[in-house]
């Protein structure tokens, strides 16, 4: 407990003499909450005083002389974030739909932005809905080129989760045709990639400051994960890759602290092609990622990154439930876990999130319902085990998007509750207008809550012909 002492000195002067009255009052005040005591730093401040010359009191009319000691408290810096146990629950339910183009009749600042590659990242107090825009809105006159992956107009934008990404709601963070973001507990880190295919550049922004860059190392479309990076104790880990979409593309991880790259991590193992990883914490020691191989296999490359040693290894998932699209029939690939099988050309980013429990861990995945097209989205789960060696099928856990609706990229993220983390999966539902009209997306969100079965799928409600 800290005593707060107030001393007051009052000096009274009269024409007949000097009357000195000294009053000292000491009182103890006790802080009611010990955590406040621990978090706040005391700082002493002393008021300036005037000197008093009493040699000739007859010349003094009236003087007040006081000295005050004041105790102030400085607000503490926010804490770095660490993964916690997941909030209780045994099933995912439909949480939210963000379908901007249901409001497509709006014009001007209320018009929805044309976007793709949405993802969500959360800090201790808020979640942000990110996307890559084509710097165009619907309705509007700039639809040409909105189906392109990379051009000079694309930007990383965000809105607070639950807001519609319109012109007036959106914050434009940086020029980018590939992106990521994460919160370390104190501040946001934003990642954007743009530039020519042969010499693209990663740019890092920490809060409002642009802080660092990273250059292409294979001169073939340097790109990042299109979902949230992951932070622990102030260190944030970002997956990047550089290489052919139909050949070798070796990934790396960047360790970033307060917006600056402090280490490069070069994974070992099955490294031929790894891109668009969806990553999360299996524990305080390990980040795991389910990734995309666009060249050789319909199995997902699975990364384990040790944050204590800053080492990473990649192997293919062994499950007979193949998670990429296009893909062969489940269980049809023979041989060891590292066998590629057929129908490995092409692919899609997949959703993946952890459910951390005291006695076990759940790994939740998403994949399209169609084996050949980006249609529908189903949820799967596997408790415990090792994705590198377990060949058993994943357990289906419900339909999030029916076969009649588009199911494109999907991603994982976690919402911070007061004492636990809520795992969620988001789904990009693309309005594919081809090259003749606008090309944009809605976002469906499913989160762990309660028990029972996943009850309802999501529709965008958008008719592009209107």
From Swiss-Prot:
Keywords: Calcium, Disulfide bond, Glycoprotein, Glycosidase, Host cell membrane, Host membrane, Hydrolase, Membrane, Metal-binding, Signal-anchor, Transmembrane, Transmembrane helix, Virion. Substrate binds at residues 116, 150, 275-276, 292, 374. The chain crosses the membrane at residues 12-34. It catalyses: Hydrolysis of alpha-(2->3)-, alpha-(2->6)-, alpha-(2->8)- glycosidic linkages of terminal sialic acid residues in oligosaccharides, glycoproteins, glycolipids, colominic acid and synthetic substrates. The active site is at 149 (proton donor/acceptor), 409 (nucleophile). GO terms for cellular component: host cell plasma membrane; membrane; virion membrane. Residues 89-466 are annotated as: Head of neuraminidase. Residues 35-466 are virion surface. Residues 1-11 are intravirion. Inhibited by the neuraminidase inhibitors zanamivir (Relenza) and oseltamivir (Tamiflu). These drugs interfere with the release of progeny virus from infected cells and are effective against all influenza strains. Resistance to neuraminidase inhibitors is quite rare. It is an enzyme of class 3 (hydrolase). The influenza B genome consist of 8 RNA segments. Genetic variation of hemagglutinin and/or neuraminidase genes results in the emergence of new influenza strains. The mechanism of variation can be the result of point mutations or the result of genetic reassortment between segments of two different strains. Homotetramer. Belongs to the glycosyl hydrolase 34 family. This is Neuraminidase. It comes from Influenza B virus (strain B/USSR/100/1983). The lineage of its organism: Viruses, Riboviria, Orthornavirae, Negarnaviricota, Polyploviricotina. The gene is NA.
């Amino acid at each position: 407990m800290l005593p707060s002492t107030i001393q007051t000195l009052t000096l009274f002067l009269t024409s007949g003499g000097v009357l000195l009255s000294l009053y000292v009052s000491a009182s103890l005040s006790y802080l009611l909450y010990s955590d406040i005591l621990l978090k706040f730093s005391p700082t002493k401040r002393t008021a300036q005083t005037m000197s008093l010359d009493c040699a000739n009191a007859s010349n003094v009319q009236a003087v007040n002389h006081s000295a005050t000691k004041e105790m102030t408290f400085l607000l503490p810096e926010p804490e770095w974030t660490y993964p916690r146990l997941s909030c209780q629950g045994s099933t995912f339910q439909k949480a939210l739909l963000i379908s901007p183009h249901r409001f497509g009749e709006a014009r001007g600042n209320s018009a929805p932005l044309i976007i793709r590659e949405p993802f969500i990242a959360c800090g201790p107090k808020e979640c942000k809905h990110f996307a890559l825009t084509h710097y165009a809105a619907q309705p509007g006159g700039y639809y040409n080129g909105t189906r392109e992956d990379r051009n000079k107009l694309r930007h990383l934008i965000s809105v607070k989760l639950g807001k519609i990404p319109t012109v007036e709601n959106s914050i434009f963070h940086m020029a980018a045709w590939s992106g990521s973001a994460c919160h370390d507990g104190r501040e946001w880190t934003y990642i954007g990639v743009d530039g020519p295919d042969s010499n693209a550049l990663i740019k890092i922004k920490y809060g409002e400051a642009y802080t660092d860059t990273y250059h292409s190392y294979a001169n073939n479309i340097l790109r990042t994960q299109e979902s949230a990076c992951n932070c622990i104790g102030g260190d944030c880990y970002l997956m990047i890759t550089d290489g052919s979409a139909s050949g070798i593309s070796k990934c790396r991880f960047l360790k970033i602290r307060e917006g600056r790259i402090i280490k490069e991590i070069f994974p070992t193992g099955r490294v031929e092609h790894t891109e668009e990883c969806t990553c999360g914490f299996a524990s305080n020691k390990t980040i795991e990622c389910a990734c995309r191989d666009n060249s050789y296999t319909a199995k997902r490359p699975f990364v384990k990154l040790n944050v204590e040693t800053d080492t990473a290894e990649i192997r293919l998932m062994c499950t007979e439930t193949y998670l990429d699209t296009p893909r062969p029939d489940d269980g049809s690939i023979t041989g060891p876990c590292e066998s590629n099988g057929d129908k490995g050309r092409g692919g899609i980013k997949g959703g993946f999130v952890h459910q951390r429990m005291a006695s076990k861990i759940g790994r939740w995945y998403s994949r399209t319902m169609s084996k050949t097209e980006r249609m529908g989205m189903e949820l799967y789960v596997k408790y415990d085990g090792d994705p590198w060696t377990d060949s058993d099928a994943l357990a289906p856990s419900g339909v999030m998007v029916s076969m009649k609706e588009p199911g494109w990229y999907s991603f994982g993220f976690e919402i911070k509750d007061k004492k636990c983390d809520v795992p969620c999966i988001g789904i990009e539902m693309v309005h594919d207008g081809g090259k003749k009209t606008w090309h944009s997306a809605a976002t469906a969100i499913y989160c762990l809550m309660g028990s029972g079965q996943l009850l309802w799928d999501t529709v965008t409600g958008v008719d592009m012909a209107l």
